[in-house]
Swiss-Prot record:
GO terms for cellular component: cytoplasm. This is Ribosomal large subunit pseudouridine synthase D. The lineage of its organism: Bacteria, Pseudomonadati, Pseudomonadota, Gammaproteobacteria, Enterobacterales. Residues 18-91 form the S4 RNA-binding domain. SUPFAM superfamilies: Alpha-L RNA-binding motif (SSF55174), Pseudouridine synthase (SSF55120). It comes from Salmonella typhimurium (strain LT2 / SGSC1412 / ATCC 700720).
């Protein structure tokens, strides 16, 4: 049985001059560029209400794009009874607080045991929504808030809201190093040229913007609040590593333990045992896809980050006289 795909969005001004298939692949990252090219050639794409069958057609920015296509369902994912921490639910959306060690969508190395499998068990009708209603993702070991659409119209509207940057996502993190001020990282991100599971800053990458401000200083670590303007894969992790302040625990992007001089064995042990990136999606704000009402949710940092921060705070108090930046 074929699955119908209906998508609408507006081309960003930042995509001026891109090929149509390239622009659409950026706008709808859950679909490959080759699939999108096929849809264009098969006249399944409207640009400003007009059929367009030329993948090489250049976009100007601001065009209204609509896709109405079908995908042959090659895989039926299994519903699995995996607990979900549901923060909010109505007829159109779910907001969940994702724990660590939980992948969002099945893929290589993770064929099941994901948020998607849990959603299929919790709300079986969501099987009729592409990707079981998943609108955006969090990395396996990133915790926090995610919105899920329960209907196709809700998903279409939420995806469009993401493209228009109408959804606000804020994170808490702990970075390595003493940071003196907040700021913005505006650096494009693409897949790493040799490590295909990694991302990296690259001049030919997709635009990526991360804003950050300082919440608390420790001896050689900094607690941050960050806001995404875009949503590239591993964006916060890559951007913080790029400015030489990788996240604590992020072994992919350089966040290996770096205890301060004279740290207690207990604190060193706490640092070494923290085996994930210290990153939590703490706030989500959006306009409801049906009512249009602005809604906002908050999720406190999980216990492992609480313990990490408490240990850093205690270390700071024990060595306050040795800190040279006070």
């Amino acid at each position: 049985m074929a699955q119908r795909v209906q998508l609408t969005a507006t081309v960003s001004e930042n995509q001026l001059g891109q090929r149509l298939d390239q622009a659409l692949a950026e706008m709808f990252p859950d679909y490959s560029r080759s699939r999108i090219k096929e849809w264009i050639l098969n006249q399944r794409v409207l640009v400003n209400g007009q059929l367009c069958d030329k993948p090489k057609e250049k976009v100007l920015g601001g065009e209204r794009v609509a896709i109405d296509a079908e995908i042959d369902e090659e895989i039926r994912f299994e519903a699995q009874d995996i607990p979900l921490d549901i923060v909010y639910e109505d007829d159109d959306i779910l907001v969940i607080n994702k724990p660590r060690d939980l992948v969002v969508h099945p893929g290589a190395g993770n064929p099941d045991g994901t948020v998607l499998n849990a959603l299929l068990h919790y709300y079986p009708p969501i099987a009729d929504v592409p990707r079981a209603g998943i609108v955006h993702r969090l990395d396996k070991d990133t915790t926090g808030l995610m919105v899920v659409a329960k209907t196709v119209p809700a998903q279409t509207r939420l995806v469009e809201s993401l493209q228009l940057r109408e959804i606000t996502r804020e994170y808490e993190a702990v970075a390595i190093g003493h940071m003196t001020a907040g700021g913005t990282v505006n650096e494009p991100i693409s897949r790493h040229p040799t490590k295909r599971t990694h991302m990296s800053v690259h001049p030919m990458g997709k635009p990526a913007v991360t804003h950050y401000r300082i919440m608390e200083h420790f001896r050689v670590h900094t607690r941050l609040r960050l806001r995404l303007e875009t949503g590239r894969t591993h964006q916060i992790r890559v951007h913080m590593a790029h400015i030489t302040h990788p996240l604590v625990g992020d072994q992919v992007y350089g966040g290996r333990p770096r205890p301060p001089k004279g740290a207690s064995e207990e604190f060193i042990s706490t640092l070494r045992k923290f085996d994930r990136q210290a990153l939590h999606a703490t706030m989500l704000r959006l306009y409801h896809p049906v009512s249009g009402i602005e809604m906002e949710w908050h999720a406190p940092i999980p216990q492992d980050m609480v313990d990490l921060i408490d240990a850093m705070r205690a270390d700071f108090e024990d060595h306050k006289d040795d800190v040279d930046w006070l």
